[in-house]
């Protein structure tokens, strides 16, 4: 008999995870604040829920794919939260990007209610989520992995087991976000210089993606700039948050991160200028004196 799996948050990553779970044959329940997204989920064969509590009462495993620690707190422990409705021995897979200390405390709080947890941030983007090929950075007790094994196999191409202590997965995720944010900022700076110097941007993209200066983020994000399409898959404000979290972690350890600080300021400038809800590649819009490619009509 197929297990009941819950997904809280049907954003770019969450909807793809739900699709992968449906494809694997699970009974998938989900909740989201947007009725149109829940309808699309229902049309795909899923079971919409009115609240996290309703979802938690139905499911053996609950995945939280929300934006941050505050949303994780709300969907698990707020009004109509999932945790109080779940049966002891069930599992929460917490996949938001959160401070490591929050992940540690979350594991303790869930354990007090008799629930297991995996600290399990994700990476790879919406396309990999939809194809079941995400990367997951996980940590937690062996019993949690036993309950999660078939779920993880359905949604991830690579699952890293980083120890039994909650927080280890989140530490690795924020280091990944350090690199991701710096690489996006560097890609924007490089393209901005090219535009300022009159280099054809399409030619520049082709050269860099076949040269040593390339990065995954350059190759993935610069096409958004070339098309003039800043429809958000991951927004500027995500990196305001995530690089802020990186810097807070380093500050706690009294550890300098000069590149991260510079990149964070770039995303802050873009957000302050009104681009916070746009795709993170819109960080290029902070540079003066350049004409960006326009979106084709």
From Swiss-Prot:
Reaction(s) catalysed (UniProt annotation): L-threonate + NAD(+) = 2-dehydro-L-erythronate + NADH + H(+)
Pfam families reported in the protein's UniProt record: NAD_binding_11, NAD_binding_2
Binding site for NAD(+): 3-31, 97, 241
GO annotation (BP), single: organic acid catabolic process
GO molecular function: NAD binding; NADP binding; oxidoreductase activity, acting on the CH-OH group of donors, NAD or NADP as acceptor
Cysteine disulfide partners in this protein: none
Main enzyme class: oxidoreductase
The keyword Oxidoreductase appears for this protein: yes
Active site: 173
This protein's UniProt keywords: Carbohydrate metabolism, NAD, NADP, Oxidoreductase
InterPro entries linked to this entry: 6-PGluconate_DH-like_C_sf, 6PGD_dom2, 6PGDH_NADP-bd, HIBADH-like_NADP-bd, HIBADH-related, LtnD, NAD(P)-bd_dom_sf
Entry's EC annotation: 1.1.1.411
Knockout or disruption consequences: Deletion mutant is unable to use L-threonate as a carbon source.
Described purpose of this protein according to its UniProt entry: Catalyzes oxidation of L-threonate to 2-oxo-tetronate. Can use either NAD(+) or NADP(+) as cosubstrate, with a preference for NAD(+).
Family label: Belongs to the HIBADH-related family. L-threonate dehydrogenase subfamily.
Name the UniProt record assigns to this protein: L-threonate dehydrogenase
């Amino acid at each position: 008999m197929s297990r009941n799996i819950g997904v809280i948050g049907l954003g770019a990553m969450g909807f793809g995870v739900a699709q992968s779970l449906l494809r694997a044959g699970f009974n998938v329940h989900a909740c989201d604040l947007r009725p149109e997204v829940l309808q699309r989920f229902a049309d795909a064969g899923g079971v919409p829920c009115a609240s996290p509590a309703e979802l938690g009462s139905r499911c053996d495993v609950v995945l939280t794919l929300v934006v941050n620690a505050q949303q994780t707190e709300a969907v698990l422990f707020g009004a109509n939260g999932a945790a109080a409705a779940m049966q002891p021995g069930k599992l929460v897979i917490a996949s938001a990007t959160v401070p490591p200390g929050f992940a540690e405390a979350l594991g303790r709080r869930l354990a007090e209610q008799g629930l297991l947890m995996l600290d399990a941030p994700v990476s790879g983007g919406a396309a990999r989520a939809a194809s079941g090929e995400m990367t997951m950075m996980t940590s937690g007790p062996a019993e949690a992995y036993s309950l999660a094994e078939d779920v993880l196999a359905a949604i991830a191409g690579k699952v890293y087991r980083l120890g039994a202590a909650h927080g280890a997965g989140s530490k690795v995720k924020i280091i990944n976000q350090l690199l991701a944010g710096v690489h996006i900022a560097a890609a924007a700076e490089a393209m901005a210089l090219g535009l300022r110097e009159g280099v054809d941007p399409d030619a520049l993209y082709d050269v860099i993606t076949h040269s040593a200066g390339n990065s995954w983020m350059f190759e993935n994000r610069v096409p958004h700039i070339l098309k003039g399409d800043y429809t958000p898959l991951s927004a500027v404000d995500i990196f305001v948050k995530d690089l802020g979290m990186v810097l807070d972690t380093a500050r706690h350890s009294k550890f300098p991160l000069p590149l991260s600080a510079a990149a964070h300021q770039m995303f802050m400038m873009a957000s302050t200028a009104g681009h916070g809800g746009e795709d993170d590649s819109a960080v290029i819009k902070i540079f003066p004196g350049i004409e960006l490619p326009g979106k084709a009509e």
